[in-house]
Amino acid sequence: FYRCSTDVLAAGLLHQEYDIVFTWDSTNLRTQEGVAFRTVEKARLVVALYAGHPLAQRRSLTRQELRGENILYMSPDAAPDSYGDAFFMQRYAEAGYKPNILFRSADTESILMMVAAEEGISLLPDYCTDRLYNADNLVFVPLVGEGEEEEIIAAWQTGNPNPALKRFIAELSETTPPY
């Protein structure tokens, strides 16, 4: 297993370095000819706040309520103009504003350290935060609204002859997604 940015995973799959990748599709892999995919998870988004933030006691938040906040932007890949970034910038536009992005990184730990240091807030998939119990100066509030989730896919090249991949995909196809 490798932990890479989504653009590195997509490139590795397209260059046949990987048989299968599990990723958020920030590069729009699903539109590539010869690539098949299956949704394996839908992760809800949460707002990471420092404990003293005025919104930290809320039970849920909408993207519209984040207008004017300094955003520590968790980008799914290293390129600053990816399909994934465009998708999320569109979500902000639909909420009626352009976000004030103070910092941009694909590194969850850096983002969370900056939130804890009260530098800003961040939107993250819940799989990045759901095991962080009693995190110092961090609070996670669900982001609500239609489409406020991240879809995780398994993607592979349809022409890949690896017999283990074929068996793995067959097994994957028999499982029910957890959402």
For each predicted feature, which ranges?
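Beta-alpha-beta core module
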Residues: 30-39, 43-44, 109-158
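Central regulatory/effector-binding core of bacterial HTH transcription factors
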Residues: 1-30, 105
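A local structural motif
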Residues: 1, 92-102, 137
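Flexible hinge/capping segments at coil-to-helix
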Residues: 34-45, 49-71, 163-166
